[in-house]
């Protein structure tokens, strides 16, 4: 600003080259002074432009700050909405994945149940076939054992029969010999009592008497032998009846034993079916749980999930039946 020394008149600036009149005095100055500081008299156009520029800059800065604040607020709102939409999208994707996983699990479960039913049907057919074969083998073995026992009983009966016949014949022979000896002693006593003279005179009669006695002894021997044979036959018949009764009792016992074997075989079949059913259910449960572990923890290396699903224990040695005990006698 170019000012005069007396501060009465001055040129505004080199740009406008206007003459500025002096400041007012008196009441006018007071009114202006109350309204605005006195030094505003000396502002040039450049100062005013600079002030306006500063005001504009401040306004622009204020507008820019407000705009930045609104942009930041809008960006925060947009990010919040984006996060919310992302969470919703992730939740929806997880729900869809869960639904897909459930569908796959249901499909695999149905396939597995179908395979298990087919396997159970085949296993039941095979088990029924094996059970029939086992029953046939048991029946054949029981028949063989029964035949062997019957043969052994018949051999014992025959041996006892032969032994009884031999004992009866031996006893009959001893009794006949004793009877002959007693008859001879009686005849000799009668001959000795009749006297030597009578014997000489009646030698022929004595010989005839001896022949008659011998014939009588032979008849008595035949009668005794026949009687002994009848007694032996009665003894043999009694022994035969006894052996038949024993044989019937043995047959009844064999029939009862065969019925018990059939009942035991039926119970064994039922227990085997239960054992197979429980084994299949256990295998199915372990397989489903293993699939669940594989789907839930796909990054687990082998052996890390053994604490969840440990290996099955081996069958104790006291529960294992040796092969030589399972074969029929």
Curated annotation (Swiss-Prot):
Residues 56-247 form a coiled coil. InterPro entries: C6orf163 (IPR038927). Keywords: Coiled coil. It comes from the Eukaryota. This is Uncharacterized protein C6orf163 homolog. It comes from Bos taurus (Bovine).
């Amino acid at each position: 600003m170019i000012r005069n020394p007396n501060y009465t008149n001055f040129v505004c600036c080199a740009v406008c080259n206007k003459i500025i009149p002096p400041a007012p005095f008196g009441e006018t100055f007071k009114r202006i002074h109350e309204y605005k500081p006195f030094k505003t008299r000396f502002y040039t156009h450049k100062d005013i432009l600079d002030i306006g520029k500063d005001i504009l800059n401040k306004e622009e800065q204020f507008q820019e700050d407000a705009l930045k604040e609104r942009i930041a607020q809008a960006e925060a709102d947009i990010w919040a909405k984006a996060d919310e939409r992302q969470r919703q999208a992730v939740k929806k994707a997880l729900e869809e994945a869960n639904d897909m996983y459930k569908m796959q699990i249901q499909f695999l479960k149905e396939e597995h149940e179908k395979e298990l039913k087919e396997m159970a049907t085949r296993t039941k057919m095979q088990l029924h076939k094996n059970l029939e074969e086992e029953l046939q083998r048991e029946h054949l073995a029981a028949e063989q054992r029964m035949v062997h026992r019957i043969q052994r009983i018949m051999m014992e009966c025959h041996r006892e029969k032969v032994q009884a016949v031999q004992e009866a014949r031996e006893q009959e022979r001893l009794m006949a010999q004793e009877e002959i000896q007693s008859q001879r002693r009686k005849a000799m006593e009668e001959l000795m009592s009749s006297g030597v003279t009578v014997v000489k005179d009646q030698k022929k009669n004595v010989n005839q008497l001896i022949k008659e006695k011998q014939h009588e002894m032979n008849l008595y021997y035949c009668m005794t032998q026949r009687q002994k044979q009848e007694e032996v036959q009665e003894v043999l018949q009694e022994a035969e009846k006894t052996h038949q009764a024993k044989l019937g009792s043995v047959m009844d016992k064999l029939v009862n034993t065969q019925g018990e074997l059939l009942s035991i075989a039926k119970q064994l079949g039922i227990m085997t079916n239960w054992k197979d059913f429980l084994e299949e259910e256990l295998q199915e449960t372990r397989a489903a749980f293993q699939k669940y572990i594989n789907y839930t923890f796909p990054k687990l290396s082998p052996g890390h999930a053994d604490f969840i699903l440990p290996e099955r224990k081996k069958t104790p040695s006291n529960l294992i039946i040796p092969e030589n005990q399972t074969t029929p006698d």
